[in-house]
Each structure stands twice: as structure tokens, then as C-alpha cells.
């Protein structure tokens, strides 16, 4: 039984419009989500379709989703070197794991509940480091003519930095690491 079963979609001939139908679907989705408040999390529901080439972390579920479609070239290739796969899919995995500890994920415990689990000292140091990232990225030109707001991009910047640090440390343990392949993949 889908939350869409009760959505009244109207064709143009019935006086409906694409915009109104999208609003009705969005409203039904919000009502469905609100109805889940206080119920156990259904771990069988995925946040993405298997054919989506992406990945995501959900702090409220403490869950990482890697759809099957991401496990193909160029993100993962059985014929690629260890460094190339680490620089591609390894980076994505490390990035999503780091979201559990970014400025948003840091506010949730291992069960996905909003909780203050840091020591005061650790959280103060974490915030200090986050401010450095905000300062670094603030005003950077992401694309020509468009500057970034370091505060708005903080979550992604923390996860990017964590992922780069992670894959760099892993590849540094190899006997003859090929950093060029790692960073170009």
C-alpha cells in the first residue's frame, strides 16, 4: 500500500496541472513521513534506487546506502589498479562514512537519535576545526563567477577532507604507492 494511492492526480482535461499534481504528491509524501514519527525504522526501505549512481548517509538512521549501479566503471573497475579503485569508490565510501562525523552527523548517536555524545573538550576542538574549514572555503570560486559560502558547504567539505585523508593514509601503507593514480581516478 503506497502513500500515493490516495493522491488525486488530475489530467489537464480534468482541470489539473503538472504543478498541482507535483504539489499533491509532495504533500502526500510529507504526510506519510510525518505518520512515521515514533514508529520503528524500516531497515528494508532504501533511500535510493539500485540504478542510481550515487551514495548517501542518513544520520537519523545511521545508515549508508551504496546502490548497485555505483559499483561499475569508472567508480569501481575489476581491471583498475588498487590505487585507482581506492581513489574512486574508496573515496566515495570514506566520504559517506565521514558524514557520520561531520557537523550534522556529529549531533546523532549510533542509533540515529539526536544526542550530545561528545565530551565538551572534543566538541569544542571539532567546532574550532570546522571554523577553519568554513574560513578556507568561504569565498572560494566553485565555478567561474560563483563563490561558496563555507558555512553552507561545511558538511560536504568535512566529508571531502576526511575522505582524502583516509584514502591517502591507506595508500601510504603500500610498498610503492602510485599517488598519481589515486588522485586522478
PLM regions and their residue ranges:
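Intrinsically disordered, low-complexity linker/terminal regions across diverse proteins
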Residues: 1-185
Amino acid at each position: 500500500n503506497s502513500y500515493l494511492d490516495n493522491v488525486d492526480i488530475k489530467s489537464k482535461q480534468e482541470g489539473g496541472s503538472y504543478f498541482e499534481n507535483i504539489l499533491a504528491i509532495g504533500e502526500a509524501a510529507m504526510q506519510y513521513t510525518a505518520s512515521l514519527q515514533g514508529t520503528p525504522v524500516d531497515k528494508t526501505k532504501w533511500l535510493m534506487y539500485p540504478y542510481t549512481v550515487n551514495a548517501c548517509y542518513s544520520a537519523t538512521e545511521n545508515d549508508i546506502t551504496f546502490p548497485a549501479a555505483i559499483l561499475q566503471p569508472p567508480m569501481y573497475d575489476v581491471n583498475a589498479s588498487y590505487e585507482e579503485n581506492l581513489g574512486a569508490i574508496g573515496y566515495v565510501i570514506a566520504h559517506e562514512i565521514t558524514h557520520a562525523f561531520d557537523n550534522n552527523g556529529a549531533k546523532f548517536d549510533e542509533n540515529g537519535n539526536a544526542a550530545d555524545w561528545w565530551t565538551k573538550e572534543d566538541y569544542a576542538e571539532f567546532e574550532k576545526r570546522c571554523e577553519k574549514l568554513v574560513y578556507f572555503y568561504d569565498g572560494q570560486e566553485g565555478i567561474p563567477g560563483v563563490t561558496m559560502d563555507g558555512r553552507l558547504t561545511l558538511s560536504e567539505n568535512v566529508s571531502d577532507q576526511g575522505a582524502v585523508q583516509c584514502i591517502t593514509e591507506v595508500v601510504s601503507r603500500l610498498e610503492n604507492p602510485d599517488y598519481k593514480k589515486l588522485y586522478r581516478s
